[in-house]
Each structure stands twice: as structure tokens, then as C-alpha cells.
């Protein structure tokens, strides 16, 4: 066994399909150039997490010592560790160092990237890096603790990278983007929320609507298919219209908020071809599709209403091991 190993995974934006993917609709998701890195070092006592964003947390190793209350921040990592142990990896004391360029709790997949990078680095420390299939399965155990009923799309894109068409229970399909001359603007509302709470709220509204909600989900699925074709054909104008329609559907099920709508309309007023929330909603981030020559105006338009904003490129590479 090595003394340490390091791995990273990309963040993501959901172009269309968040929430609806939970009940079988299509989602289009893209990895972005911002990455999260995890370094695992053996030694010490128990399991220790060190993160500039999440602080320092520690706990006994699973199955060792008296039962102790574990920080909610550590619980997903422990779930991943248990899954690794079930696959034959030895459980040893170690420290997890997290370095992230992905804002946490913002809908950009930081949680999934962290679970993926942790699972890959821990398995690599033992000299046997997980395969992509096993990496997905192990990381999902952590996401279930973090989010309750994750669709799996965040973990999939963190493992694979690129742009994917994703439907729950089916193999993801790689999309070859034909878009040129456009870029994504990402603006953070600065409002933190628990993904699990938003997912449960949206599902409760869908259930309350009864049969009517089936038409909303059907429309979301059709919109996602149109988005796939627009991306492949390079039709940015059409993709923008589709993003706007998707925002309306998400709002109808209670996923939006005043902060989100403010950023959406500021981007549209600044020339965005389309703008919508990405991720769970109730806060987190908004994405806007801009022509490259107009994105600076978009950045200026969201300065006062966002905690941070940046342009995002598509990351072709998913999870990877890294040298020290």
C-alpha cells in the first residue's frame, strides 16, 4: 500500500433535465473545467477530513471504538469507505485533504466530485484504482447519504467528463457538441440549500398535482431531446430557447426562487440566448448561454446579484489520478 494518493474530478452544469431526471426523464449534463482534488494520506487515528471550505472533522474508523456522533460532513465519506471495505479494500486510519475550485452547495456537483475523487484516491493508495463502473457505484453510496435520492447524473459526469445524455437506469450517451462561438456564464446566488430538501419539495408538488404532473414531466423529456439535437447541430439560438422553457417547467414545480429569477432575467436582459437554474434550485447557481462577444456584458449584469460569477468551458476529461 502506498502512503498517499491524489485524484480529481470535474464539476458540472445541467443544461436541462434536473429534477425531472429523478423520475425517468432525460437530462443533458456537461462537465466544466473547474475541478475538485482529494489527497488521501495513510496514518494518524481514525478518519480526518481537512477542507478550506468545510473545515476540519474527525471520527473513529467504522466498526472501531465506541459509537460516536459523526459530523454530517463526514457521513458521506464514511459511507464510501464502507462500500470500499465491502469490495475488499482494507480500512486504515487516514486523512482526506480536499482542495476545490467548485463552489460548494451551489448545484455544480462539488459533492459528487468529492465522493468520486475520494473513492479513486483511496483505492489507488491501496494499489488497485477502481474501474469507472465500480467508481460510480461506490461514490453513489456517499451521495445517497448527502442527498437522499440522487439521480446519479452528478456522479456519472464526475466519473466520465464531457457532455452526456443521461436517463436513470440506462447507459449514458456521449454527445459531441457542435456549438461554436458561445460560452456559458455561471453565476452563484450565494444562497446555500440542501439538495435533499429541494428534491423532496419538488416531488411533493408533483405528487400533489397528480395526473397533471405527468404532462410536465413529458414536456421536460421532449425539451431535453430537443436540447440534445440542438447541441449536436450547433444551433445555439434554439438551445437558448430550450433553456428558457426548461426554467419555466422547473419554476412550475417550485424549484426556483427570487434570487434565481433575478439572475435569470439579468442575464437575458444582457443578451443571453437562454438562462436557467442549474442543479437543485432554491439558490445555488444560474447558467446563461452567451455569444462569446457578449459574455462580458453578461458578467457585468450579474455582479450586484451574485456572490461570484465566471465563464465555464466544457471539460472532456472526467475523474483522474494525479501526481504530487
UniProtKB/Swiss-Prot annotation:
Subunit structure: Homodimer.
One of the protein's GO biological processes: isopentenyl diphosphate biosynthetic process, mevalonate pathway
Keyword Lipoprotein: no
PANTHER family, A to Z: MEVALONATE KINASE
Pathway: Isoprenoid biosynthesis; isopentenyl diphosphate biosynthesis via mevalonate pathway; isopentenyl diphosphate from (R)-mevalonate: step 1/3
Source organism: Aeropyrum pernix (strain ATCC 700893 / DSM 11879 / JCM 9820 / NBRC 100138 / K1)
Protein task: Catalyzes the phosphorylation of (R)-mevalonate (MVA) to (R)-mevalonate 5-phosphate (MVAP). Functions in the mevalonate (MVA) pathway leading to isopentenyl diphosphate (IPP), a key precursor for the biosynthesis of isoprenoid compounds such as archaeal membrane lipids.
Gene name in the database record: mvk
GO CC annotation, single: cytosol
Record InterPro entries: GHMP_kinase_C_dom, GHMP_kinase_C_sf, GHMP_kinase_N_dom, Mev_gal_kin, Mevalonate_kinase_arc, Ribosomal_Su5_D2-typ_SF, Ribsml_uS5_D2-typ_fold_subgr
NCBIfam families tied to this protein: mevalon_kin
The protein, known as: Mevalonate kinase
Residue ranges the record marks as coiled coil: none
